[in-house]
Amino acid sequence: MKLNPSLLTAAGLVSAQLASALPQASSSTVSPSPSPSATPGSFVTTSGLNFVIDGKTGYFAGSNSYWIGFQKNNDDVDLVFSHLQESGLKILRVWGFNDVNQKPTDGSVYYHLLADGTATVNEGEDGLQRLDYVVSSAEKHGIKLIINFVNFWDDYGGINAYVKAFGGSKEGFYTNDAMQAAYRAYIKAVISRYSDSTAIFAWELANEPRCQGCETTVLYNWIESTSQYIKSLDSKHLVCIGDEGFGLDTGSDGSYPYQYSEGSDFAKNLAIPTIDFGTFHLYPSSWGTTNDWGNGWVTSHGAACKAAGKPCLFEEYGVTSDHCAVEKPWQNTALNTTAISGDLYWQYGDQLSGGPSPDDGNTFYYGTDDFKCLVTDHIAAINSRK
């Protein structure tokens, strides 16, 4: 998802800014590194067209929270994971990147400083120790995390943060030696912290990687080599791309998302041996399609994943209004489509110590009517199939 600052509520912005900038006085801000998981058997795996979590094979629901790793109040993090656990949501996708070109002077959390041709990983209390606590809390609450390493969009730095530090272009990121060396060094720094944690559902190459106007071989080669590198560092966890699902002949109606103009070939990329499952997103209002069109998008990706012999994760989907009416049919379609083994709505909202968590327009909050429709009732539908 590309964040739209104009849609963030004032309350959500205040909450996010306070959480990331202000140190908390209580002892709850101590940030322990996550301890290694107890049993190797609890690592997430795949079985045919399904995910296997904690020994259970089937369909799993979850959400996205780009902001949780930037909170400085541990109680807020624990509150979110407690509510996820209570609701039956099993997977949370979080931003594993926070790239800056200048070190913040206000105490804001950042993970990775890119400046003047150099890259420095921030392992301090205002850096990856915040992600440490997210992983630790996820372990305690039985939630699985998808952690990605860079953003195609400019939110929290993204690829353009690398471009500003090393030169070149956004499209050139995938083949530029200096940028790729910094990117891989960051991947290694993150994976080395959590390679033994069973809280990790999967490592994800990027949020919505695109290469507009490029031959599809550019992204393919980058995905292949990067996923191989990740597997060389950690063979225990799944690896995925984080793409939107663009570039697909199966079920194509010729509309923009099915085309190859963003440099992506969904089926070809999915066939890479070191990619364990497919990811796809759905934002009709951003893509010039209708809400009803989304159901065909879901089934087309299910068919492509079935052909590849790998499960699909419906990884992001959202609208800015009528959440229940619009998103419920997508959930039902995904739940009843072979090879789709989970969905994560965009995005989770909760009441934090500083106010509501950020609302980019697609957010709905814990305990609301939309939450009952799209989480409580959805989990009940999933459980009724078991």
UniProtKB/Swiss-Prot annotation:
Uppermost EC category: hydrolase
Compartments where located: Secreted
Stretch forming the signal peptide: 1-21
GO BP terms in the entry: mannan catabolic process
Predominant cellular place of this UniProt entry's protein: secreted
Annotated active site: 208 (proton donor), 316 (nucleophile)
Function: Endo-1,4-mannanase, a crucial enzyme for depolymerization of seed galactomannans and wood galactoglucomannans.
Family, per entry: Belongs to the glycosyl hydrolase 5 (cellulase A) family.
Descriptive protein name: Probable mannan endo-1,4-beta-mannosidase A
Organism whose genome encodes this protein: Aspergillus oryzae (strain ATCC 42149 / RIB 40) (Yellow koji mold)
Taxonomy of the source species: Eukaryota, Fungi, Dikarya, Ascomycota, Pezizomycotina
Gene: manA
